[in-house]
């Protein structure tokens, strides 16, 4: 009588939980970039990795519930983006590794002890935002040499945005610009923000990064700028693709791609406490010439020469 071979148990497939602060449509390219990063680390969705994705729809009030739901699934790694979403996930767990795809200032927010030595369960990418607002404001001034009054859209609930707002104030003083603070903390604030910019007669507007509400509504924001013939500056090119005038910043898909490789390292045994937080080194200036024409703006040739991409 032959000996029956024992069936081998199926190998466990690791699980990654992903909390995206925006809509599925807005996050599409970023999700694909993250999956590519995981693939390069040897993890293919549906074969060697399982993904659990939740979308915040640009509403930070939903983040705590979605974070709790993801943590209850006991993933091996959590990936998220923007300070409100990172904070929501971190409140739910101090043991499951968390990879930040985008954070304004993780040291100031307390997510990590330092960029070189995170020290806890959080690591990933920082956008060094506090150093960027001045450059963006200066570029906006270069586009409009006669600029004197700029509306600044921001979310005061985002700690990194508070730091960047202070930076923008300092640079504005040096450029002799008057800043109008326009707070956007919820979807309902957007119409009020548009009304405030119109009534105060802003000559241009400038969006601080890390605002999932604004990212989810970037088409509406860009459309407002065109209708009011207001030049605009944004932190990422996704706004310019939707009709905004200019952006200066790192590539979001590139950061999500890198977050995927971080998740892969952790799945292979690396500890987030020992993985330094990375900062982007390449920043792109993108100008939408179609929008410039629509709002009656002639972009100075010197600025056009500095652009990394011109959208015709």
Segment roles from a protein language model:
Residues 1-312:
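Short hydrophobic alpha-helices and adjacent helix-cap/hinge residues
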């Amino acid at each position: 009588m032959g000996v029956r071979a024992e069936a081998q148990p199926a190998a466990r497939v690791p699980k990654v939980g992903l909390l995206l602060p925006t809509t599925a449509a807005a996050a599409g390219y970023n999700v694909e970039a993250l999956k590519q990063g995981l693939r390069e680390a040897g993890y293919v969705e549906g074969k060697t990795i399982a993904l659990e994705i939740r979308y915040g729809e640009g509403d930070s009030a939903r983040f705590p519930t979605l974070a709790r739901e993801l943590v209850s699934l006991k993933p091996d790694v959590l990936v998220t983006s923007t300070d409100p979403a990172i904070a929501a996930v971190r409140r739910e767990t101090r043991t499951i590794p968390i990879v930040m795809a985008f954070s304004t200032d993780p040291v100031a927010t307390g997510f990590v002890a330092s960029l070189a030595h995170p020290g806890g369960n959080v690591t990933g990418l920082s956008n060094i935002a506090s150093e960027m607002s001045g450059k963006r404001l200066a570029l906006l001034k270069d586009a409009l040499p006669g600029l004197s009054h700029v509306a600044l859209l921001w979310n005061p609930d985002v700690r990194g945005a508070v730091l960047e707002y202070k930076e923008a104030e300092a640079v504005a003083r040096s450029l002799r610009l008057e800043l109008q603070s326009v707070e956007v903390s919820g979807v309902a604030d957007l119409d009020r923000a548009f009304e405030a910019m119109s009534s105060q007669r802003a000559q241009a507007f400038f969006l601080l990064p890390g605002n999932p509400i604004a990212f989810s509504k970037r088409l509406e924001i860009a459309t407002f700028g065109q209708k009011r013939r207001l030049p605009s500056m944004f932190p990422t090119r996704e706004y310019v693709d939707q009709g905004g005038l200019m952006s200066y910043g790192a590539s979001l898909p590139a950061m999500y791609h890198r977050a995927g490789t971080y998740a892969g390292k952790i799945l292979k045994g690396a500890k987030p406490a020992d993985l330094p937080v990375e900062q982007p080194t390449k920043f792109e200036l993108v100008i939408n010439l179609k929008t410039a024409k629509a709002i009656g703006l002639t972009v100075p040739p010197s600025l056009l020469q500095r652009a990394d991409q011109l959208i015709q």
